[in-house]
Amino acid sequence: MEAIVSAASVIAAGLAVGLAAIGPGIGQGSAAANAVEGLARQPEAEGKIRGTLLLSLAFMESLTIYGLVVALSLLFANPFS
């Protein structure tokens, strides 16, 4: 029974990282595309657009880091065993 729990934890860790990266990856691509479009329309607003973009990318990346933390806790501090 413990082997099944260990195997399920490894699979869940992989799914946690993979699924946690899908949403932010799509969001970051969309944000970067819109930032480039905004820069093409208004080059004089480059500083403001860049600052907002970097802040929003950091918030989106934090979701992926939370998925990584969940995966690491499933692998090394397994709460099910």
Curated annotation (Swiss-Prot):
Keywords assigned by UniProt, alphabetized: ATP synthesis, CF(0), Chloroplast, Hydrogen ion transport, Ion transport, Lipid-binding, Membrane, Plastid, Thylakoid, Transmembrane, Transmembrane helix, Transport
Localisation per UniProt entry: Plastid, Chloroplast thylakoid membrane
Site (Reversibly protonated during proton transport): 61
Matching Gene3D superfamilies: F1F0 ATP synthase subunit C
Pfam family membership, one: ATP-synt_C
Family annotation (InterPro entries): ATP_synth_csu_bac/chlpt, ATP_synth_F0_csu, ATP_synth_F0_csu_DDCD_BS, ATP_synth_F0_csu_sf, ATPase_proteolipid_c-like_dom, F/V-ATP_Csub_sf
Recorded family membership: Belongs to the ATPase C chain family.
HAMAP family: ATP_synth_c_bact (MF_01396)
NCBIfam families: ATP_synt_c (TIGR01260), PRK07354.1 (NF005608)
Protein name (record): ATP synthase subunit c, chloroplastic
Species this chain originates from: Cyanidioschyzon merolae (strain NIES-3377 / 10D) (Unicellular red alga)
High-level lineage: Eukaryota, Rhodophyta, Bangiophyceae, Cyanidiales, Cyanidiaceae
